[in-house]
Amino acid sequence: MKIIGGPFSKVPIKNKDGLFEINDKNLYFVGSGRIALYIILVSILQEHTVSSVLWLPAYYCDVGWHIASQLGYIVKYYSVIFKDGNYTIDLANASEGDVVLFLNFYGFSQKKIQDEIRKNKKKGCIIIEDITQSLLSNNKSDFADYYFASIRKWTGVFTGGVIYAKGISKFLNQDVNLELVNHNKSFFEDYQNYLITGEGDRKYYSSCFYEAELMINSNYAKLAMYQPDVELVGKWDVKLVISKRIQNAECLIRNIKNKDILMFNEVKKGDVPFFLPVYLEDRDSVCKLLDSQGIYCSVLWERPTGCQVECNLYDNEFGLVCDERYSIDDMKRITDIINEIVN
């Protein structure tokens, strides 16, 4: 049985029209999204007069706290509440000179978040925009001082993150984490076959990816992206990826009967879904049933260290896969199961 969901292990290739202008002087490829954030936070401390306060969204990965704390930042969280198709955030206490990190969740347009970016930029805050989930969307702000993303979350490179900002080059090096590269090389091909056939040990591949994450977390000294990965990204068939993700997300939206569980009920112009987010009171039982059918949903994050502010997503939100690896029939396989168990 074909597996739906899970990390990527292959890059769809076209000979031209990749996502990035490789020679853009403000574009820097690095080893991962985490390394990108690390470099940005280091550069801010050295290049700006700041308060050393970093505001993170209450719905975010724990890695952000760990990186910032190690660098001496005082990490504070701002509330993130999802209601009636919008994320509402509270940054009333952010002050001039503070550093604020934003992201557009799941690649869907969020006017309120864009308004907050503009407002806090005018307030005198330094703005970082994590564009990982909106990497292919046309809904990023024009007001951030720094942009970064994980490429690894979108396609099957061994290494891959990107920074878009001025003056970052002095903080980079050319050292590649070859331990990570060789580790991923050792199992990516077999994992790709597992996704197609369902034949293999899921626990083994999960442990391989977990080990890869530990390799990234334990080594921020080797900053560079593996050059063959840079070349692959230059040939990445982005048009195919965008088209398939939109098509698949629209199929999910159209065929899920209970529209109340959908956090977004349309794909707007310029949106390219990272996943299709769903909100359910009994999320864990639904995910467990989907998992038993070879459909692995994405629960993005657990509540990060020290986060006590309000957020209504950690226990109830999950993402349905809609990427280019899957067909309309695969999407209907997902919705058929959901429609059976969700009233």
Question: What is the meaning of each model-derived region?
Answer:
Residues 1-21:
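S-adenosyl-L-methionine
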Residues 14-17, 24-28, 33, 60, ...:
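PLP-dependent aminotransferase class I/II
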Residues 41-94:
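Conserved PLP-anchoring active-site segment centered on the Schiff-base-forming lysine
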Residues 19-23, 65-70, 92-95, 115-119, ...:
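Short loop/helix-cap segments at secondary-structure boundaries that form the rim of catalytic
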